[in-house]
Amino acid sequence: MADEVVGQEYQGNPGAFSPQQARQIFRAGTVAHTSGYSRGYAQANLITLPQEQAFDFLLFAQRNPKPCPLLGVLEAGQVSSELLADGDIRSDIPLYRVYRKGQLDSEVPDVRDVWREDLVSFIIGCSFTFETALLDNGVPVEHIAQGKNVPMYRTSIPTNSAGAFSGPMVVSMRPIPAAQVADAVRITSRYPAVHGAPVHVGDPAAIGIQDLNNPDFGEAVDIPAGTIPVFWACGVTPQSVVMESKPEFAICHAPGHMLITDARDLQYQVP
C-alpha cells in the first residue's frame, strides 16, 4: 500500500490523500511540506519534552492559547492517540527537529532512534487547517499557489512565561488582497483551535520583522501587488521558546512539515 500511495503522490494531488495515506507516505520516507495535503483535515504542530518539564509546558500553552492551542497531549511514552488512530508520532511526520539544550542537533524523517519512554508529546493546532476554508471562499493562499512552504518569523511580541519556558511569538504570513483582508479575518476567526484571527495586519516592522524576504522558518513568497501582509500566531512558537529556554532535550516537527490528523477541520470551526 505504501508503494502505491507514494506512486500517487508523485502523480500529484496530495490534497486528495486521506490522513492515513499521507502518514503512510511520510512513514515510508517521503519528505514534503504539508500545506495543501489532505484537504478537509486538521494539521498539527508537535513538541515532545521529558516528563519532568511537561507541566511547565502545559502551563505555558494554557497561558498562550493563541500561538499554542492544544489539540491533545500524549502521556509519557505514548506514540498514538485518537487524532492518529493507526499512527505513530515518531515516524508519521515528514521531518523532525531534535534539539539538545536549545541547539538544533539534527533534522531527521524518523525519531524512533532517539525516542525515550519519559517523553510527553503536545499536539498543537496549525493554521494550515483553515487554508481550505480560505480557498473555498475565494481568498488566495500564495504559498500554496507558489508551491512553497509558508514563511514564518520571530517577532517582538512576547509570550507569557511559565516555569522554564519563555520567548517571543512566531507568526506565519500570508499576503492577502486588500479587498479580501476582512474576509480572511472573518473566516479564520472561526477557527480558534488552530490560531484563529490574525494577530497583526500590515507593517511588519510594527511587530519586529525587518525583512519579509528573510523568514526565520519556511520560505519567502512573492508578494503580489495590491496585497497586504497578514500575520497569524504560529505553532512554531514552541521551537522559538525551546531555543530561548534551552531544555535538555526536545523533539519538534520541522516547520511546515506537519502532523496530519484524522480530525476534520470542521470540528474546529465555531459559529
From Swiss-Prot:
It comes from the Bacteria. Belongs to the D-glutamate cyclase family. The keyword Mitochondrion does not apply. This is Putative hydro-lyase jk0403. It is an enzyme of class 4 (lyase). Keywords: Lyase. The keyword Lyase applies. Its EC number is 4.2.1.-. InterPro entries: D-Glu_cyclase, Putative_hydro-lyase, UPF0317. One of its GO terms (molecular function) is lyase activity.
